[in-house]
Amino acid sequence: VLLIRLAWGVDYPYTKMPIEGIRNLDKMDIDFAREFGYRIKLLGRARMRDGKLEAGVFPTLVNHTYLLARVGGAYNAVRVEGNAVGSLFLHGLGAGSLPTASAVLGDLISIARQNNKLNSGFVKQVLPQADILPPEEACSTYYMRFMVKDDPGVLRDLSGALSDQGVSIAQAIQKGQSEAGVPLVFMTHEAPVSAIRKAVETMRKSDFLLAPAICYRVMG
């Protein structure tokens, strides 16, 4: 929300932002992502599409060649893309005892000095509300994992449910059977959130899906 204010000078209400954590992240997904050439990172992303702001926080498969994919430990990073400057990358400590203590101490000193000057670049006036793109209209390529029964026709039914919503499959992987079923993984071409949700809802009503579908956005 703060970066959106700085980048576009608009207010995006926190309560309206789609947020998904890593509670459902499984080691299986980390391994599959690596096999496709990606690493999973929890990203907050925002971009302007046709004058409307698309934003959210999601676990995301990041191409392993991107600098963002290499950020780990107590480090955080910000990637900015501009029309003229291209891609900019800021990287540094964002957690840990010393960086946190430094930030807190800086705030305390500022308060003690009664420093009421605005920071450089801070927009003083009340910010206008962002024109928000409805979350279901956001588009992305997707990583999708399904735990299914080892029955004939399952792959056909899954791909058919996606095809019915206009979602095409770029890659697919099927691994050996386990007690939890057979993991079937798709990487899709770009598709709207609404199409992915409708396809998953259709699959949920079938008898071959043994666990909730896992869907993560893909970057790169």
Question: Can you annotate each of these PLM segments?
Answer:
Residues 1, 24-28, 72-75, 95-106, ...:
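Conserved active-site and cofactor/substrate-binding residues in soluble primary-metabolism enzymes
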Residues 41-42, 56, 79, 89-91, ...:
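Structured core elements
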Residues 45-47, 81-83, 147:
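A generic structural motif
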